């Protein structure tokens, strides 16, 4: 007999339409409304990348691809998909309540972020656990999946494909910048989070398996809290690497993200490219995983290792 289980896919969320931007931003800021200037800045960024972020559609596609792959991988389990978002509807709590209404008593949870930190993945899991406890739903959490061979294979392939576009004699003048979303330094230290080490490990695995010679680790998209965040920032890092090594080609792999969205399309494709243009270097940024079978397969393999 087939066992019915929930698959709770959790993600950050993004505004669906312009009128969502203010409540979305207010939720990110724990209920504190943004100033007109801050709101306009965010609207300008969305406008710059061609309108609202494609994240919402991509998140849906990733969740659909994952539940489909899982149902093929497990002959004796039927997974039903639930989407829970951090900062916009359907919220994580709504998804767990819907599970209960559908009679689901057990579920696997996955956050669309490959590295673990208590600030990101841990906070999603906590919200899901608190809601699930009301209904007696048992949750099994995927903590991370950056070590999965298919995840590393995806990025290794992308790095090698990008290198193939660069003349071989310039490979020695090419650097790979591996990055993830910066987080408050104090929180990482206080919780002894493995987050920075997990990014370093990702970079090492990519370097070992790809043809890249030079590699550097950076952080991006830090918040404006007035407290120190993990660094160096990718823009500062780019200038620093150029000053020290005169690299001609910069390849950016924001491996902490899983699709094209504001942080990649603006913070990398605009802000980092501006720096590259300024120093006279070439900017490269391979395609993000989105629904690539290797990426979806990496999450399936991680689930198989814990369930």
Swiss-Prot record:
<dbReference type="Pfam" id="PF00762">
    <property type="entry name" value="Ferrochelatase"/>
</dbReference>
<dbReference type="InterPro" id="IPR033659">
    <property type="entry name" value="Ferrochelatase_N"/>
</dbReference>
<dbReference type="GO" id="GO:0005737">
    <property type="term" value="C:cytoplasm"/>
</dbReference>
<keyword id="KW-0627">Porphyrin biosynthesis</keyword>
<keyword id="KW-0456">Lyase</keyword>
<keyword id="KW-0350">Heme biosynthesis</keyword>
<keyword id="KW-0963">Cytoplasm</keyword>
<feature type="binding site" description="axial binding residue">
    <location>
        <position position="12"/>
    </location>
    <ligand>
        <name>Fe-coproporphyrin III</name>
    </ligand>
</feature>
<keyword id="KW-0408">Iron</keyword>
<dbReference type="GO" id="GO:0006783">
    <property type="term" value="P:heme biosynthetic process"/>
</dbReference>
<dbReference type="InterPro" id="IPR019772">
    <property type="entry name" value="Ferrochelatase_AS"/>
</dbReference>
<comment type="pathway">
    <text>Porphyrin-containing compound metabolism; protoheme biosynthesis.</text>
</comment>
<dbReference type="InterPro" id="IPR033644">
    <property type="entry name" value="Ferrochelatase_C"/>
</dbReference>
<protein>
    <recommendedName>
        <fullName>Coproporphyrin III ferrochelatase</fullName>
        <ecNumber>4.99.1.9</ecNumber>
    </recommendedName>
</protein>
<feature type="binding site">
    <location>
        <position position="181"/>
    </location>
    <ligand>
        <name>Fe(2+)</name>
    </ligand>
</feature>
<feature type="binding site">
    <location>
        <position position="263"/>
    </location>
    <ligand>
        <name>Fe(2+)</name>
    </ligand>
</feature>
<feature type="binding site">
    <location>
        <position position="53"/>
    </location>
    <ligand>
        <name>Fe-coproporphyrin III</name>
    </ligand>
</feature>
<feature type="binding site">
    <location>
        <position position="29"/>
    </location>
    <ligand>
        <name>Fe-coproporphyrin III</name>
    </ligand>
</feature>
<keyword id="KW-0479">Metal-binding</keyword>
<comment type="similarity">
    <text>Belongs to the ferrochelatase family.</text>
</comment>
<comment type="function">
    <text>Involved in coproporphyrin-dependent heme b biosynthesis. Catalyzes the insertion of ferrous iron into coproporphyrin III to form Fe-coproporphyrin III.</text>
</comment>
<feature type="binding site">
    <location>
        <position position="124"/>
    </location>
    <ligand>
        <name>Fe-coproporphyrin III</name>
    </ligand>
</feature>
<dbReference type="GO" id="GO:0046872">
    <property type="term" value="F:metal ion binding"/>
</dbReference>
<feature type="binding site">
    <location>
        <begin position="45"/>
        <end position="46"/>
    </location>
    <ligand>
        <name>Fe-coproporphyrin III</name>
    </ligand>
</feature>
<dbReference type="InterPro" id="IPR001015">
    <property type="entry name" value="Ferrochelatase"/>
</dbReference>
<dbReference type="GO" id="GO:0004325">
    <property type="term" value="F:ferrochelatase activity"/>
</dbReference>
